[in-house]
Curated annotation (Swiss-Prot):
Keywords: Disulfide bond, Plant defense. One of its GO terms (biological process) is defense response. Pfam families: Cyclotide. InterPro entries: Cyclotide, Cyclotide_sf. The presence of a 'disulfide through disulfide knot' structurally defines this protein as a knottin. SUPFAM superfamilies: Cyclotides (SSF57038). This is Cyclotide mobo-B. There is a cross-link at G1-N29 (Cyclopeptide (Gly-Asn)). The keyword rRNA-binding does not apply. The lineage of its organism: Eukaryota, Viridiplantae, Streptophyta, Embryophyta, Tracheophyta. This is a cyclic peptide. It comes from the Eukaryota. Belongs to the cyclotide family.
Amino acid sequence: GKPICGETCAKGKCYTPKCTCNWPICYKN
């Protein structure tokens, strides 16, 4: 699978650079 950014995106947005939301977890692009 994709590398996990260690961030959740419960609010629908990832703040870690180059990460995207695949609710509820942020993944690196």
